[in-house]
Amino acid sequence: MKNISYNQAIEILRNYNTILIDVQTESDYEKKHMINSINVPVEEINRKITNMVKDKNQIIIVYCLKGIRSVAAYDMLKRLGYNNVYNIQGGIDS
């Protein structure tokens, strides 16, 4: 698993074409999220991501509040064949 810190995520976002996916529920996303993130609840990753991200080499960063749901989302994305997936370890509350 490619775990990164919040600060490392910010650097990647500044320097590379990156998709930032918040995997919290919609209600949690409305309470707290990173700017320019896309909300795709973890339960919807398998159904939605292949239509959203066609390039399997696209850099994708996943996160949630505590870093639990994002681990599941990371695993799903890897199983779907995405190669450049990163997880913000501990979530945005870390």
Regions found by a protein language model. Give the residues of each.
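Flexible, polar/low-complexity N-terminal or interdomain linker segments that lie immediately upstream
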Residues: 1-31
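Conserved beta-strand scaffold positions in the cores of enzyme catalytic domains, especially
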Residues: 3, 20, 37-39, 85-87
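Short, flexible helix/strand-to-coil boundary loops that buttress conserved ligand/catalytic motifs
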Residues: 33, 49, 89
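Short, structured coil segments at secondary-structure junctions
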Residues: 33-35, 81
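Helix-loop module immediately N-terminal to the HCX5R catalytic loop
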Residues: 36-61
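Catalytic cysteine-centered active loop of the rhodanese-like fold, especially the PTP/DSP P-loop
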Residues: 52-94
